[in-house]
Amino acid sequence: MALHDARPPFAAIGGTVPPEFSALPTPCYLLDENALRRNAEILGGLAQRTGCRVLLAQKAFSNYDLYPLLAPHLAGTEASGLFEARLGAEEMPGEVHVFCAAYRADEMDELLRYADHIVFNSPAQLAKFGAKVKAAGKSVGLRINPECSTQDGHAIYDPCAPGSRLGTTRAAWDA
């Protein structure tokens, strides 16, 4: 049975809206905690079976009231900058990984208080901050742009599109 076959359908899709919904202010977000828990359990099982570490991408989901529900199944959080790193460190147990297209020198000391792993976008950023990050006992990464796009028609969203500034290319690495 496919995973999507096991999920109950949402009543409002092709059905009726539950009466409780009419009392809610709009717009608002509705979250199904049971579905969220099931998905977290699936991710936790994946981590156990493969040895990988699954992180919560806070850019996509930063509802920290639900972090306690997710925490038993995830290794930590991923952040795109200082404020998300702080949120992850304060609200979710586990690792905090940070990737940012460019880091600010005036934020690096504070970022190092929260981050466990920092990924740089270019050899220049790695050269500028790498030694300081390592001296603070944090692990370091460099985002690589493989320059091999897997999609057509959406170059603006494609990190491997020609001209993308996300990750270092072979030419930039060799320079």
Regions found by a protein language model. Name each.
Residues 1-17:
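Acidic, low-complexity proline/glycine-rich segments
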Residues 52-175:
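Active-site-proximal beta-alpha core segment in soluble small-molecule metabolic enzymes
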Residues 24-33, 52-58:
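A glycine-/small-polar-enriched, mobile loop at the entrance of the PLP active site in fold-type I
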Residues 20-24, 44-47, 62-66, 155-156:
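A short alpha-helix capping/helix-coil boundary motif
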Residues 12-16, 41-42, 48, 53-61:
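N-terminal glycine-rich anion-binding loops that anchor highly charged ligand groups
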Residues 34-42:
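A non-catalytic, amphipathic alpha-helix used as a structural packing/dimerization or gating element
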